[in-house]
Each structure stands twice: as structure tokens, then as C-alpha cells.
């Protein structure tokens, strides 16, 4: 990690031809995401809300589903990645089909984390909490005589994957 984030989705054209892929592992639930411009978005349970690290989540936009239905690669696809059958999108993995046996403790852990998010005020409250944590750390860094953010640009500094560096003269 480098301690940075993309600050907004303004750079993604609304009339783009291709698909926009987003690894939102450190952003899901803790940052506002431009969902209307993201076609394939992934994250895992362990980030932001805490929890089990071995399981991933996938969100596909209607554009991504269209691509699945209109494009068939000339190479064999592993079963795990087959999301279309006979030119039609297969929603099996989005409606309960098991790809990999998930521990029910892991599922319960994720559900418990979602209940906590709801109890705290939902996703907007978690985004605010994450930004407040970054602000508290920024205040500390601002008063430190040795710590600096690895990402100097405030607009791209991540509130979840924070990286600090030693900036003291004696260290460099």
C-alpha cells in the first residue's frame, strides 16, 4: 500500500467504451465511491469493518453484465470465473450458489459487522468516522517533529491505508 486513494470519479468518462475495474478493498464502506461509474468492483470482508480476510465480494454493473453476455474469450475459463452460460449471464453466484465453502462463522462475522455499521448510522457515519480518524492522525503528524505522510497531497491521502514516513533530519 502507498497510503493514497483516488479522490473522486470525475476522471472516468460517463460515455466510456470499456469497463472500469475498481479494487475497493480499502475503500468499501469507508469512502464514498462513484458507483455509477464503476463496472466491476471487488473488496474483501476484512477491511474497514474488520472480520475474516479470506473472502471476496464482487459487484457488477449492468455494463459488466452486458460484456459477459457479448464476449466469450478464445481461451478456456476456470469454473470459478465462468459467469455466463450460452451467452447469458448466470446469476448463480449472486443468488446463493457456493463457489467455495465459506465458514458460517465468517458469514456471521460479516453480518455482525454490518449490524454494527447500521447501529453506528450506516455507511455515511462510517465514512465520517474514517475521515475523522485521518484528521486526528493528521493533527498528530502536524505537531510531530519526525513523522510525515508518505502521500503529501491531502486530496489523494487515504483514510484507511495510511502510511507514514520518518522525515526527521537525523534519519535522512
Model-identified regions with their sequence ranges:
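Solvent-exposed alpha-helices and their adjacent loops that cap or buttress functional pockets
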Residues: 12-15, 32-36, 48-52, 154
Amino acid at each position: 500500500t502507498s497510503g493514497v486513494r483516488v479522490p473522486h470519479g470525475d476522471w472516468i468518462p460517463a460515455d466510456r467504451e470499456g469497463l472500469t475495474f475498481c479494487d475497493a478493498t480499502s475503500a468499501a464502506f469507508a469512502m464514498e465511491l462513484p458507483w455509477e461509474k464503476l463496472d466491476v468492483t471487488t473488496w474483501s470482508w476484512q477491511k474497514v469493518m474488520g472480520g475474516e480476510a479470506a473472502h471476496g465480494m464482487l459487484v457488477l454493473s449492468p455494463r459488466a453484465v452486458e460484456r459477459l453476455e457479448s464476449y466469450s474469450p478464445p481461451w478456456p475459463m476456470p469454473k470459478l470465473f465462468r459467469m455466463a452460460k450460452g451467452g447469458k449471464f448466470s446469476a448463480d453466484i449472486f443468488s446463493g450458489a457456493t463457489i467455495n465453502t465459506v465458514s458460517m462463522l465468517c458469514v456471521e462475522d460479516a453480518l455482525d459487522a454490518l449490524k454494527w455499521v447500521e447501529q453506528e448510522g450506516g455507511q455515511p457515519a462510517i465514512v465520517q468516522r474514517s475521515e475523522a480518524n485521518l484528521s486526528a492522525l493528521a493533527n498528530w503528524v502536524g505537531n510531530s517533529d519526525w513523522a510525515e505522510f508518505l502521500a503529501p497531497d491531502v486530496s489523494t491521502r487515504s483514510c484507511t491505508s495510511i502510511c507514514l514516513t520518518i522525515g526527521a533530519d537525523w534519519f535522512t
